[in-house]
Regions:
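Conserved N-proximal alpha/beta basic substrate-recognition cap immediately N-terminal to
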Residues: 12-115
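C-terminal active-site "lid" helix and adjoining low-complexity regulatory extension at the edge
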Residues: 245-246, 250, 259-266, 273-316
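Phosphate-binding site of ATP-dependent enzymes
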Residues: 150-259
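Short glycine-rich anion-binding loops that position phosphate/pyrophosphate groups of nucleotides
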Residues: 57-60, 142-143, 287
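Extreme N-terminal starter segment of soluble prokaryotic enzymes
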Residues: 2-8
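Short, solvent-exposed loop/turn elements at beta->coil junctions and helix N-caps
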Residues: 40-41, 178-183, 271-272
């Protein structure tokens, strides 16, 4: 690795990063990976690189890397206090780590998003019984890879889930009970990938009832089952991804507002459309696992585009 890299990439899942690292090497970019799963940093050491790019994931704990998230957050805050440029930095990562804060941001922007109740004790939901419609979606505040997301029918069922397995609260001891919104399963949900504030591509994702919608071919390959730490909660066909060139301009404009408000450098925004015509935005992803097969239908390699962006930032 170069002793004085221009770029340092924070990460915790080497398989996800292989295409990006290969593209950086092809282009001759002086970069260095920084694996936050087993790391240390000095608060007195100055930044080594001109640019840092955060690719750490909230789902790190699912791979036994629980300590990666606080290390990444602390390191980025230190770097930024020292004046370093960090793409998808500490504030963006903190937003990605909290579905509750994401929901509040969307509401503040006047964007339709599922009603949510955040809680750290299942019994406390009873005080909000008048706000809940059933079924509802139970999901962790620190999400990732669709883990621990369930459709539930009652407060009693929620209480039973945590009583049966207290470790369900981990890693952050916060959950959301969120409005359940049906959508056309043939249309799926929509994910918009952004790079530098501009739409890179849009895709439709047919979930088949699954919640792990990770676009990385490592997790959801085009030709079969992936290597993923999240077992499928239901017996269902694999998740399918389709290029969506006809994505409505209004949806793109709304997503751009989210990207700008979140100060997201690279990432994905997800929404669904309900049978009664609501377009509901519900997820902000800073760690964007790009889908080469979808981007190929638009005529480009998405990782080459990311390298174009990183090189432009180095020259800025």
């Amino acid at each position: 690795m170069p002793t004085t890299p221009d770029l340092i990439v924070l990460h915790e899942h080497p398989e996800w990063q292989k295409p990006l690292f290969a593209a950086l090497q092809r282009r001759g970019v002086a970069f260095e990976p920084f694996d936050v799963t087993r790391a240390a940093f000095s608060n007195t050491a100055p930044p080594r690189a001109r640019l840092y790019f955060n690719q750490a994931s909230p789902s790190a704990y699912l791979r036994g890397n629980t300590r990666a998230v606080p290390l990444a957050l602390a390191y980025m805050r230190t770097l930024q206090q020292q004046g370093a440029r960090v793409l998808n930095g500490a504030d963006v990562f903190a937003l990605e780590l909290s579905k509750s804060v994401q929901a509040t941001l969307l509401q503040t922007l006047g964007i339709d998003t599922p009603r949510s109740i955040t809680f750290n004790e299942a019994a406390a939901l009873r005080a909000h019984a008048h706000e809940i419609t059933w079924p509802a979606v139970l999901k962790p505040d620190q999400g990732g890879s669709g883990a621990r997301i369930e459709v539930v029918e009652s407060i009693e069922q929620v209480e039973a889930i945590f009583r049966r397995d207290p470790s369900y609260w981990l890693p952050d001891n916060l959950f959301l009970l969120q409005e359940y919104l049906p959508h056309d399963p043939e249309q799926g949900i929509v994910r918009l990938e952004f790079l530098g504030g501009q739409l890179l591509y849009a895709m439709r994702v047919k979930t088949h009832g699954r919640f792990n919608l990770c676009p990385s071919p490592v997790c959801n390959p085009d030709d079969g089952d992936g290597i993923c730490e999240i077992p499928a909660a239901v017996e269902a066909p694999p998740v399918e991804f389709f290029a969506y060139p006809e994505v409505p301009a209004a949806a793109v404009a709304t997503a751009q507002r989210i990207v700008q408000a979140a100060r997201l450098d690279v990432g994905g925004i997800e929404y669904l459309e309900t049978p009664d015509g609501r377009r509901v935005f519900y997820d902000i992803n800073a760690n964007s696992n790009l889908r080469p097969s979808v981007a190929a239908e638009f005529g480009f390699d998405p990782f080459e585009r990311v390298v174009d962006y990183l090189v432009a930032q180095l020259r800025a």
